[in-house]
Every structure is written in C-alpha cells, then in structure tokens.
Design a protein with these regions (language model features):
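Active-site phosphate/pyrophosphate- and oxyanion-stabilizing loops and adjacent acidic/basic residues
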Residues: 59-60, 99
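Active-site micro-motifs of SAM-dependent methyltransferase domains
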Residues: 44, 78, 122
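Divalent metal-binding pocket/active-site signature
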Residues: 1-40, 52-53, 60, 65, ...
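Short acidic/histidine-rich active-site segments
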Residues: 68-90
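A general structural signal for short secondary-structure boundary/capping elements
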Residues: 67-75, 115-122
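Short glycine-rich anion-binding loops that position phosphate/pyrophosphate groups of nucleotides
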Residues: 49-50, 77
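Hydrophobic faces of well-ordered beta-strands that scaffold small-molecule active sites
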Residues: 22-24, 44-46, 70-74
C-alpha cells in the first residue's frame, strides 16, 4: 500500500460490497486514507511501528481510528517495537505494542485487550 493510498481506496470502493471484512494490515496511512477507510468500516492492524520515535504523525492518525476496528500484530520477524529495536521481532512483543496504544489513547489497558479480542473474533468470524 505504500504510496498507493488513492489506488487502494479506488479498488476497495469498487469491491467493498463483495467483501465481508477489510483489514488494513500494518496500518501506517495518512489521515485522509484513514478517513476513507473509516467510511468503509475497515479493520486496522497496528504493529511495532506505533512505538517508533519518528512515528508521531501515525500516532496522531490512529487516535482517530475507532477502537472497535483495531487489532494488533507483531509482523514478526520485522518491525520490532521500541525498546527492542535491533532484535528479531517475536510474538511476545505484542504486549509492548498494546501497552503503547493504551498510552497513546489514554485508555484502560484491560478495555483495549477485551475490545481487540472481540475485534479479532468479528474480523475473522470466530464464534
């Protein structure tokens, strides 16, 4: 999706009716892209990028994403969150990503865990 937000919106808009759920993997989009995806009820996976020192713009954008559409990922073995940069990313670092999101959103960590678990179930239609 890098440098292809307009193309992606055009494609998603064209096929939205045929898709049950849309996941924007490893979301790093602009505010405009986020706004368009919100209109299409997309889900967003957030990775270790939200912990990076130079990700202030992304952190501001994700504040506008609805919590009921957020899931978390490590994207292992890549995108290791701070303070573990330089190491191979592992699933155990998911906790670091969720804790950072909790701080960004000033939201209770337990609520985020509960909501994101529910989101996984809805997104992947796990009952």
């Amino acid at each position: 999706m890098r440098d292809a937000e307009e193309d992606m919106i055009d494609i998603l808009s064209k096929y939205r009716a045929k898709l049950s759920n849309i996941l924007i993997h490893c979301f790093t989009g602009s505010q405009n892209f986020a706004n368009q995806c919100i209109k299409m009820d997309c889900y967003y996976s957030l990775s270790g990028i939200i912990t990076f020192k130079n990700a202030d713009i992304l952190r501001n954008v994700i504040k506008t994403l609805p919590l009921n559409r957020i899931i978390f990922e490590t994207d292992s073995p890549y995108l290791t969150p701070d303070p573990f940069r330089g190491k191979t990313n592992e699933p155990k670092y998911l906790k670091t990503i969720i804790e950072k999101y909790s701080k960004i959103m000033s939201t209770d960590l337990e609520n985020i865990k509960k909501e994101s678990t529910s989101n996984y179930k809805k997104l992947f239609q796990i009952f």
